[in-house]
């Protein structure tokens, strides 16, 4: 179905892979195969073809949006008679555990930083804004990591609010997947980037998702463009289990790893453990808190096998 023939009853324009790839226009490939190999996640096949057909058109679209935003800022400055500072453009990336949000974020960071209009692109994950393990243990929330109540939302909202307010240096806490905790005194300083990519489970959530912690503004209020990375639930579970098995042979073997004991599991035990963790924690969080936010996104990327994007929906 062509773009013109699509229903007016949906807020999204829908593109199959070939339709979306055609929108690349003449945007050059700026990444080498070696650079792409460094960007992909532990359990993903990221190819030059995927970058060319999916991410280059997306970077072109984002460059249009960012340029439009800069013109809007210039109009406001002209109206006010001021010469204000440049305010970061914020892109959020949401989706399930194991869907490949981090890879999407890293690829976009690499591509967007090569556009001459916006060289400084920072990437922050919301994992750093989880409450420390000590707090989660005190509140009985260790098995609820990633659920709304496990985040220090006041700190996260203040972080993005300060960035949008033009604060010169803003700090973000850093999370370690090795120790499964926020790194004490490990804050990262973000100094007025042109673009901030904010990646996490909760970046599309709003105040209604936090009835236990009411506040009037939320992360999504400060986001300029939002992306939801989607995939069928059966694929998500498979990817989660496969990732767990690779961690079992890799990161979990480190004696300092919080999950070091999992390295001693047999393959069958590891598969069963991962399946249980998926069902009891990650699937539950997906159904209750993440998937309901999908239609709030500016753009939805739907993946099929091998993490290949097969469909893109763009909000009109």
UniProtKB/Swiss-Prot annotation:
Per UniProt, subcellular location reads as: Cytoplasm
Q: What class of enzyme is it?
A: transferase
Which residues hold ATP?
95-102
Pathway it works in: Cofactor biosynthesis; coenzyme A biosynthesis; CoA from (R)-pantothenate: step 1/5
Might you give the EC number(s) for this enzyme? 2.7.1.33
Protein origin, superkingdom: Bacteria
One example GO MF annotation: ATP binding
UniProt key word Nucleotide-binding:
yes
UniProt cross-references to SUPFAM superfamilies, sorted A to Z = P-loop containing nucleoside triphosphate hydrolases (SSF52540)
Pfam families, A to Z:
PRK
Q: Which PANTHER family match?
A: URIDINE KINASE (PTHR10285)
HAMAP family in alphabetical order: Pantothen_kinase_1
The protein depicted here goes by the name: Pantothenate kinase
**What would be the name of the gene that encodes this protein?**
coaA
């Amino acid at each position: 179905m062509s773009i013109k023939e699509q229903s007016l009853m949906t807020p999204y324009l829908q593109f199959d892979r070939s339709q979306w790839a055609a929108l690349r226009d003449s945007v050059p490939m700026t990444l080498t195969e070696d650079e792409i190999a460094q960007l992909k996640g532990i359990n993903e096949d990221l190819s030059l073809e995927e970058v060319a057909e999916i991410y280059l058109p997306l970077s072109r679209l984002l460059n249009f949006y960012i340029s439009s935003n800069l013109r809007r800022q210039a109009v406001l400055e002209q109206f006010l008679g001021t010469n204000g500072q440049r305010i970061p453009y914020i892109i959020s990336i949401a989706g399930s555990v194991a869907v490949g949000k981090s890879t999407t974020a890293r690829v976009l960071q690499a591509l967007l930083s090569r556009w001459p209009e916006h060289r400084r692109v920072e990437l922050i994950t919301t994992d750093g804004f989880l409450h420390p393990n000590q707090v989660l243990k005190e509140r009985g929330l260790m098995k609820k990591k990633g659920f709304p109540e496990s985040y220090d939302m006041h700190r996260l909202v203040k972080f993005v609010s300060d960035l949008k307010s033009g604060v010169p240096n803003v700090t973000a806490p850093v999370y370690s997947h090795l120790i499964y905790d926020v790194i004490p005194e490990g804050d990262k300083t973000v100094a007025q980037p042109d673009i901030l990519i904010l990646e996490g489970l909760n970046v599309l959530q709003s105040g209604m998702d936090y009835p236990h912690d009411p506040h009037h503004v939320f992360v999504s209020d400060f986001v300029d463009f939002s992306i939801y990375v989607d995939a069928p639930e059966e694929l998500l579970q498979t990817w989660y289990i496969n990732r767990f098995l690779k961690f079992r042979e890799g990161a979990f073997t480190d004696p300092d790893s919080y999950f070091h004991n999992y390295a001693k599991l047999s393959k069958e035990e590891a598969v069963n453990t991962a399946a249980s963790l998926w069902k009891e924690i990650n699937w539950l969080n997906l159904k209750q808190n993440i998937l309901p936010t999908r239609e709030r996104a500016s753009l939805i990327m739907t993946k099929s096998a091998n993490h290949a994007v097969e469909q893109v929906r763009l909000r009109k």
